[in-house]
Amino acid sequence: MSETKTFEDKLQQLEGIVSELEKGDRPLETALADFQTGVGLVKELQGTLKHAEETLAKVMSDDDKLTDLELTND
């Protein structure tokens, strides 16, 4: 039975993949497989962040209705 990876575990795995790909010394087949794994991790991480944003919006709502959480890039 496999253990579910946390957001942080997945992010660390993605960072490792990026680091290895940036070196440029992997065989093409390995690099493509790593890239594909990385894309899958990005999609999972984005989904987790979207869910967290939706949860925060619900928690921060005064009237228990879903409201948009405005994010700024200050």
Curated annotation (Swiss-Prot):
Q: Can you list the GO cellular component terms from the UniProt entry? A: cytosol; exodeoxyribonuclease VII complex
- Where found? Cytoplasm
Q: Name one GO biological process term.
A: DNA catabolic process
Primary location group: cytoplasm
Q: Which Pfam families match?
A: Exonuc_VII_S
Which EC number applies?
Answer: 3.1.11.6
- Is Hydrolase one of the keywords? yes
Instruction: Offer an example of a GO molecular function term for this protein.
Output: exodeoxyribonuclease VII activity
- Top-level lineage group: Bacteria
Q: Which reaction does it catalyse?
A: Exonucleolytic cleavage in either 5'- to 3'- or 3'- to 5'-direction to yield nucleoside 5'-phosphates
Keywords from UniProt, A to Z, are:
Cytoplasm, Exonuclease, Hydrolase, Nuclease
- Keyword Cytoplasm applies: yes
Report the family membership.
Belongs to the XseB family.
Q: What does this protein do?
A: Bidirectionally degrades single-stranded DNA into large acid-insoluble oligonucleotides, which are then degraded further into small acid-soluble oligonucleotides.
| Complex and partners | Heterooligomer composed of large and small subunits.
Question: What is the official name of this protein in its record?
Answer: Exodeoxyribonuclease 7 small subunit
| Taxonomic source organism | Leuconostoc citreum (strain KM20)
Protein encoded by which gene: xseB
